Amino acid sequence: MAVAGPAPGAGARPRLDLQFLQRFLQILKVLFPSWSSQNALMFLTLLCLTLLEQFVIYQVGLIPSQYYGVLGNKDLEGFKTLTFLAVMLIVLNSTLKSFDQFTCNLLYVSWRKDLTEHLHRLYFRGRAYYTLNVLRDDIDNPDQRISQDVERFCRQLSSMASKLIISPFTLVYYTYQCFQSTGWLGPVSIFGYFILGTVVNKTLMGPIVMKLVHQEKLEGDFRFKHMQIRVNAEPAAFYRAGHVEHMRTDRRLQRLLQTQRELMSKELWLYIGINTFDYLGSILSYVVIAIPIFSGVYGDLSPAELSTLVSKNAFVCIYLISCFTQLIDLSTTLSDVAGYTHRIGQLRETLLDMSLKSQDCEILGESEWGLDTPPGWPAAEPADTAFLLERVSISAPSSDKPLIKDLSLKISEGQSLLITGNTGTGKTSLLRVLGGLWTSTRGSVQMLTDFGPHGVLFLPQKPFFTDGTLREQVIYPLKEVYPDSGSADDERILRFLELAGLSNLVARTEGLDQQVDWNWYDVLSPGEMQRLSFARLFYLQPKYAVLDEATSALTEEVESELYRIGQQLGMTFISVGHRQSLEKFHSLVLKLCGGGRWELMRIKVE
């Protein structure tokens, strides 16, 4: 079986080129789906804010020339009026700049939400998450691209947004204006101003620190959720759990985004404080100079000399230099954005390509699990045969070495099959083909029943437990607890936990629906994890149970008891195992001998 082809554009070296532009434009279509979308309206709001902000900045820039007159003429009343006007303009400008930053942050959150959920839809469609993490090696760290790269891309892009959209206006205008225009008191005042600003900002920062720590925790939880899918992609794929994991991962995303919105609301007041003190500092020099001027210290200077003293920091030139400096500073940010664009764009192109191909070859869709039908309800069309294999040959991905050759097999209800053989002979590989995770290199594999409670259920070699309550572990991967079942469902779960030898687990978790803050893999032993998997199997009650060494950590006595209960519940087993004690629960044994050879024998009933 061949590994899936390389990612679109995988051979190209990421650069600031046409491919970058194409990928960037495709991402923009996700961020701005229409002119009337929320993101487009916020971006238009940002443009209006920056234009208004630049108008106010220009008015502030005219203040120095007016100061020249009042200071040169020693007009105290005029100075007071002008200073009041300047302070009002500075406060207005600081507020506008704060809302500018606030809007950029809201854009970041909204962009991240839309882009991440877009990638989630593609990633959890079918078994794309399994293919990317297990069968392909051309897309590195898809979880990092979705969680970290998207976050950094949106943050960097939002930090550039206001500067980029206003730069053409400011550069042209201030270039023209620049072309046309061609003691102890100071230190004490400056230090006092600095100390005051530090105290105010320290007060405003207090509520932010705790919220920021919580945000970083949720960021780690969100990354861990994707890591959990990556590490357990195969068990999740056997469970056909893409839909439920999609919901759970989006749920963690929503918690993170809600915390970020709360954090940014608190940061708004900090922005106002910081920016107000930043811009008030621009007139501090005038205030410092005004005191000695009106006290007669500079009485011997002419008006021209006073003007020279006051105009040391000419507004237009300084601001023009600042505009160019900002653009130069953005070059580093732009290179980062280009890198993230290529990584996200390549992942998106690969997922879209896989999605198009899977429409033709996918055996079953998300409805395959019957996720909205509780176990115990009648199936629509019961089937007597689960799998029909005709001259099937199997090889591992990226390998031509045959594991199984020309296998013909019919697995029917009541005819349990035991698969044995040494390590590396293809036992689990055969289950992967039955589960649709791999394709056979030759022959025909037909699955004549459904996945889920009324058809086939796989218990992978490595038990899989998602985040959630004890009830959610037992009913997994069903999405919801069915309200119509009520206490009857509770009784079934408790009974099956007891049959699996886990009645004490209810006390440890303080109930079926108590949220736990631990990782199930950290608190359960290997034997307990296998017992809990059987409790899940009993609850779902499939007609066919495919077990990949599902009792390897249990004693033969416990193994026999669990198999006996499964038989009483009407299950037909397809088991991979090594113990001879398993034979009494099966009708046939398929022995894989290596090199593609196999033997199919009927087990004699003694």
From Swiss-Prot:
One protein family per Pfam: ABC_tran
GO biological process, one term: transmembrane transport
Effect after changing G426A: Decreases interaction with LMBD1. Decreases colocalization with LMBD1. Decreases cobalamin transport activity
UniProt-reported outcome of changing Y319F: Does not affect ATPase activity. Does not affect cobalamin transport activity
Superkingdom field: Eukaryota
Zinc found in the keyword field: no
Every ABC transmembrane type-1 domain range: 39-332
Transmembrane segments: 43-63, 76-96, 190-210, 279-299, 314-334
Impact when changing R432Q: In MAHCJ; decreases interaction with LMBD1. Does not affect lysosomal subcellular location. Decreases ATPase activity
CDD domains registered for this protein in UniProt: ABCD_peroxisomal_ALDP
Protein topology in the membrane: Multi-pass membrane protein
Catalytic activity: an R-cob(III)alamin(out) + ATP + H2O = an R-cob(III)alamin(in) + ADP + phosphate + H(+)
Predominant location category: endoplasmic reticulum
UniProt-listed Enzyme Commission number(s): 7.6.2.8
Residue ranges annotated for the ABC transporter domain, each copy included: 389-603
Disorder: Methylmalonic aciduria and homocystinuria type cblJ: A disorder of cobalamin metabolism characterized by decreased levels of the coenzymes adenosylcobalamin (AdoCbl) and methylcobalamin (MeCbl). Clinical features include feeding difficulties, poor growth, hypotonia, lethargy, anemia, and developmental delay.
Function: Lysosomal membrane protein that transports cobalamin (Vitamin B12) from the lysosomal lumen to the cytosol in an ATP-dependent manner. Targeted by LMBRD1 lysosomal chaperone from the endoplasmic reticulum to the lysosomal membrane. Then forms a complex with lysosomal chaperone LMBRD1 and cytosolic MMACHC to transport cobalamin across the lysosomal membrane.
Protein name, UniProt field: Lysosomal cobalamin transporter ABCD4
Species the sequence originates in: Homo sapiens (Human)
Gene: ABCD4
